[in-house]
Curated annotation (Swiss-Prot):
Entry's Gene Ontology molecular function annotations: ATP binding; ATP hydrolysis activity
Subunit structure: Monomer and homooligomer; homooligomerization via the interdomain linker inactivates the chaperone activity and acts as a storage of HSPA5/BiP molecules. Interacts with DNAJC1 (via J domain). Component of an EIF2 complex at least composed of CELF1/CUGBP1, CALR, CALR3, EIF2S1, EIF2S2, HSP90B1 and HSPA5. Part of a large chaperone multiprotein complex comprising DNAJB11, HSP90B1, HSPA5, HYOU, PDIA2, PDIA4, PDIA6, PPIB, SDF2L1, UGGT1 and very small amounts of ERP29, but not, or at very low levels, CALR nor CANX. Interacts with TMEM132A and TRIM21.
Organism: Equus caballus (Horse)
Post-translational modification: In response to endoplasmic reticulum stress, de-AMPylation by the same protein, FICD, restores the chaperone activity.
Gene Ontology annotations of biological process type: maintenance of protein localization in endoplasmic reticulum; negative regulation of IRE1-mediated unfolded protein response; negative regulation of protein-containing complex assembly; positive regulation of cell migration; post-translational protein targeting to membrane, translocation
GO cellular component, one term: endoplasmic reticulum lumen
Activity control: The chaperone activity is regulated by ATP-induced allosteric coupling of the nucleotide-binding (NBD) and substrate-binding (SBD) domains. In the ADP-bound and nucleotide-free (apo) states, the two domains have little interaction. In contrast, in the ATP-bound state the two domains are tightly coupled, which results in drastically accelerated kinetics in both binding and release of polypeptide substrates. J domain-containing co-chaperones (DNAJB9/ERdj4 or DNAJC10/ERdj5) stimulate the ATPase activity and are required for efficient substrate recognition by HSPA5/BiP.
Protein name, per record: Endoplasmic reticulum chaperone BiP
Enzyme Commission number: 3.6.4.10
Cysteine disulfide links: none
Length: 15
């Protein structure tokens, strides 16, 4: 799950 979180964080920052 940590790996997926990294990608999610990038998207959240964009928003």
């Amino acid at each position: 799950e940590e790996e997926d979180k990294k990608e999610d964080v990038g998207t959240v920052v964009g928003i």
